[in-house]
């Protein structure tokens, strides 16, 4: 298998963590989907990462679909549960975590536009989403080490990934001070091999002039 990613992408990281948890052999290909010479557009009509290329050359996207696929071909460890109640809870945490990442991405893209096109109001709107999303995660987590059903699953992959993405893209938000239980949660999971082996890194993208 081959996995096309952007180095800082939290969505790609979710897939990378899942692949490592399931011990599936794969090759990682790093791309910059925002740049003109990206190879991503040839693999996904939306021009987005991650993209999983299977041994039979099938292209699978986005992260949620890929991880569902991985759960089918390698059932253990199970990342999405079979029972409806727990699945709904996990999907809700995943949606909140992905929404936090979406807002961080939008701020990042706004900040790389030329100065006279940057909208402070747009950025403030995204910052509000991030804070409210973290507040929701904090309340839902409470004093637990896992979000749903006391075992590691897609909710934890999504939540942890979103916390570290906020760290690298939105450093001025001191979420650890604001939400100490999320900090404790981060410390509990930070040494997990699949997280330690998939730390995100920054990439340079072309300036946005429109």
Predicted regions and their residues:
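Aromatic-glycine hotspot motif
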Residues: 52, 64, 129, 133, ...
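Short, hydrophobic secondary-structure boundary micro-motifs
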Residues: 77-82, 146-150, 175, 196-201
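GST-like domain detector, emphasizing the conserved glutathione-binding G-site
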Residues: 1-121
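GST-like fold's C-terminal all-alpha helical module
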Residues: 97-187
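Long hydrophobic alpha-helical segments typical of transmembrane helices together
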Residues: 176-210
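Non-transmembrane alpha-helical segments in soluble domains
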Residues: 67, 71, 91-94, 134, ...
């Amino acid at each position: 298998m081959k996995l096309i990613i952007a180095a800082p992408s939290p969505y790609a990281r979710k897939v990378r963590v899942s692949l490592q948890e399931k011990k599936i052999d794969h090759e990682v290909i790093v791309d910059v989907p925002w740049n003109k010479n990206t190879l991503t557009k040839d693999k996904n009509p939306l021009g987005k990462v991650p993209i999983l290329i299977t041994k039979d050359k099938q292209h699978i996207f986005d992260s949620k679909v890929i991880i569902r696929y991985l759960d089918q071909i390698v059932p253990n460890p199970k990342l999405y549960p079979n029972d409806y109640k727990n699945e709904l809870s996990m999907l809700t945490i995943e949606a909140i975590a992905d929404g936090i990442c979406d807002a961080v991405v939008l701020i990042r893209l706004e900040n790389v536009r030329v100065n006279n096109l940057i909208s402070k109001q747009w950025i403030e709107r995204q910052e509000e989403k991030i804070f409210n999303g973290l507040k929701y995660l904090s309340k839902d987590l409470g004093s637990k080490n896992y979000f749903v059903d006391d075992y590691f699953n897609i909710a934890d992959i999504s939540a942890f990934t979103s916390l570290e993405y906020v760290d690298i893209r939105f450093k001025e938000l001191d979420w650890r001070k604001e939400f100490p239980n999320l900090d404790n949660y981060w410390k509990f999971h930070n040494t997990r091999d699949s997280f330690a082996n998939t730390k995100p890194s920054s990439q340079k993208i072309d300036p946005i002039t429109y």
